[in-house]
Amino acid sequence: MKTISNNNTESNITEKMDTSKMDKLELLEKCKELGITKCSSKNKSELIKLINSKIKLQDVIDKESNMTISNEVINHHDTPIDELTTQSLNVIDLFCGCGGMSKGLTDAGLNIIAGIDIWDKAVESYNKNFEHNAYCEDLTKMPPEKFNELYNKENKKIDILVGGPPCQSFSIAGKRDKNDPRNALFMEYVKYLDYFKPKAFIMENVIGMLSKKTANGENVIDIIMEQLNRNYNCIINKLYASDFEVPQNRRRTIIIGIRKDLNILPKKPESIINTTQDRIPVKTILIPKEEIDKKYYLSEKALVGIANKKGKNKQKGFGFGAQMLDIDKPSYTIPARYWKDGYDALVKYNETEIRRLTIIELKRIQSFPDNYIIDGSNKDIIIQIGNAVACKFAYHIGKYIINILQ
């Protein structure tokens, strides 16, 4: 047995051994060294099995970290990145909604401390799916100092900040230019960055934020990046969720930042899907036709309306009034407005059998598991789904961040 010491922290690294050549007394002594108890009554084969299992477990632990971090309170400001385990990377999810981002990051192995959202329905859904809590708060009235006092009572170091300041909320009522992010919820996000100084952040938003301008003609993204670049090395990514195992062509802006003192330059996350042909088609998430309730099918009046609207829009050059899914390809983007008529993504069997997607199918398109609880009226549920970050997309972004930091 050899002992490695690093910064006064010791870990025992077990060398590989041939347990089959040991007698029972040697095996019992080895069990004692490995901390295996209550084994004196075991026979030789049982002892070998116990020892090999312990060694295998130790090897896994050793690969995760070259040292065992003590149970003392650690100041993560001073803890080298390579000494941190995945479980020690703590996350706050701002504008968390019903939890799509948190679900993906949790599955990736990150530790969510808390979520915050202003919509009570979304927070109620969130809290039915996680051990930690989300809190229904207005960020303009919840400065990070207050958050820390109320919801981070153990004063855990926040390593990653995530969230997507709502594009439609790029303003606070009564204040200057509504498109100027300096007047917006975006600045509340910046306040949390400045206060917690996390190692990394992930900011998600619609692709349209890249072309938005203020009343003065300034590019919104330039103003945003001016704030973010102060303390972080940043990269702006335009990513398709369908490249990350999501059955939906949802295109999003993802800004990733790594704190400058870490001397890491983030790169664009690599697609998980190699070609467009390998993207997950919508047919993989559809419920069999015979199981679909009649209420999801369009009425004759609606079918006529779609046909008429299609013709009018063609004449005006606006495209189609309703979008029929190609079931051999990923779905169109599912927006929060889908609850109104469902015309953004329809399943067409023939000219007289066209239907909307069910709640379960909408969840699957956003890569929520079927057992993920989203509560409220149909309208509330669909808005929550449409506003969410696709879980599988968040999962792969989480894995990307973990790889950067470790």
PLM features per residue range, with description:
Residues E145-K157, Q168-I327:
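Class I S-adenosyl-L-methionine
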Residues E72-K197, I207-S211, A215-N219:
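Core alpha/beta nucleotide-donor-binding catalytic domains of modification enzymes
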